[in-house]
């Protein structure tokens, strides 16, 4: 039984590529092992922002050679009338380096054919890995990739080295000039950039000594413990966000949780206006009051390093966050000085898509569609005006200062500004819910106005973009048509809606 360790040392890779790459590596190594009749007890794949690591535990080659049958010509053309071999048979034997005595006749789809049976010697683990590892790595696919140097390989980021160890000895392979050996690197600023690995057993310990925690699960646990510890000190709880946590785990090699504070004046802003710069732009965890759920004037950050000079780190991060919050307050104050309706005319200057008009024209289509669906779905007359109003205001926030700067807040700011402009709850809620669901498995719109407006918005976009031949092709979906279509279907199924149409 053998053990194999492969580290792919890369330049810092985007966090949203990491999980898919790990999955591909595991699947491709499993296929490599199966295809070559090897066995393995465990395939473990780990990662940090600067490396992907594969462990093959107890990998072994087949103990017996495999008997394979090679099909040749049919018996009907293999011999002449006197039973002598014809050219097709002689050519087949020559190509297989076989004799007439090696010929076996077998049935194949109802006819007799010539076969040669050979023993194929099983390859050793060393041979299989040496011949295939680099091609396997080359076969990993990404939404976007790059080339570097004169190599044929394309990857999300340049590969700078391979660490390749089989049974505590370097397993070399041709990697187009990329170094292959037993040298790895530690943390970019805290660790050594030349760590010699003598045995597979010492690998993770040596990384840890150089401020790299290889296990993403361990990094996640450390982050959660750190967040909870600071929460106890501040008397609050960090805002749970699985996507943010996953991202942070994948951008650090040695996590340390630190806490900073902000001026309470910023808490006068809508909660979403504070949370968005914290989470989406700075990757901080907001802190909530355990009883009220209101924001507290703190933020939690995960540093990629130890706690040395933590005050300087907190101060620097606070300056960046405060600058963002000042911008947000400035934009919010400007936007709030006008009713939401006053922005609608500006939509005439915002193109929806070439050939499909501007956003103002889209709102006109949404007004027509929601009116039609109100009748088709036998909805009460009491929501007719709210639907019309929600459709009219649906895109107004897109031209506000806040949404131009923080695009993630589309719909959300529409709801906030609608409420500040004394629009009804139905109207305000629909403006936000039109974009739901905004990802796979996300919440669906709940209000009837939100459901109808969301359906209308999705159908208008899908039909219009398909009319302009903007199709979904494989993994390419730049206009989120797949997400819109799946969202539309989920809304229809969830609410038992029979049918809606798109006509003007």
Task: Please place each PLM-identified region on the residue numbering.
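Amphipathic alpha-helical "coupling" segments that flank catalytic cores
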Residues: 1-502
